[in-house]
Amino acid sequence: MLSGDIPPNQTVYLRNLNEKVKKEELKRSLYALCSQYGRILDVVALKTPKLRGQAWVVFSEITAATNAFRGLQEFDFYGKRMRVQYAKTRSDCLATEDGSTAPKEKRKKQEEKAAEKKRRAEEAQQSGPNAAAQSNGTGYQASRLGKTSQEPPAPPNNILFIQNLPAETTSMMLQILFQQYPGFREVRMIEAKPGIAFVEYEDDSQSMVAMQALQGFKITPYNPMAISYAKK
């Protein structure tokens, strides 16, 4: 079906997605990827046999959906080229199950939001002033983002230090975001230190572009990324 046959609307339909990706990771990755185009109301991805490899993203504005439609066509997502079109109707993303399950889905979303708030509170308690600046086994040391006036921020270089990541963030989620900018090399995460990561580019001018573009970007509705240069 040609996307041109369907009028623009708030919901984009994504297909040719990697079926091996777990449902929750898929939803989080799609949220992180699509949030740069506008405010997201919902991401729906089900693992039933008929709906594998597909997802729906509902934006608050048609213009946001249009930007995603244009920007994500053929995007390399978990090793497969994404196919994007507008949903036939908004109900395409809401009627994927029998209507009687709607209250259950609503309760599930409310529970997920409550769990996310709880995780944020726990992460805030665990993140002491030294958590982000300790040596971490990667050969780099995180800059402290000005937490102490005695320690100046690291000078520009090709490696970015990312903080305030939700605990469920994966390296693939970050790769999907940062590989959109020229010169991307790799993402490094530390299993023993959730919530932080290092992203390497070919040179400092390329890392600066990515930093400026993604500073404060929210991988989830509650976690704006804090980006600085890594200390070598």
Swiss-Prot record:
Q: What biological process terms from GO does the record include?
A: mRNA splicing, via spliceosome
**What does the UniProt entry say about where the protein is found?**
Nucleus, Cajal body; Nucleus, Nucleoplasm; Cytoplasm
User: In what ranges is there compositional bias, type Polar residues?
Assistant: 127-151
What Gene Ontology terms describe what this protein does at the molecular function level?
RNA binding
Assembly, per entry? Component of the spliceosome where it is associated with snRNP U2.
Family, according to the entry, reads as follows: Belongs to the RRM U1 A/B'' family.
Q: What is this protein called?
A: U2 small nuclear ribonucleoprotein B''
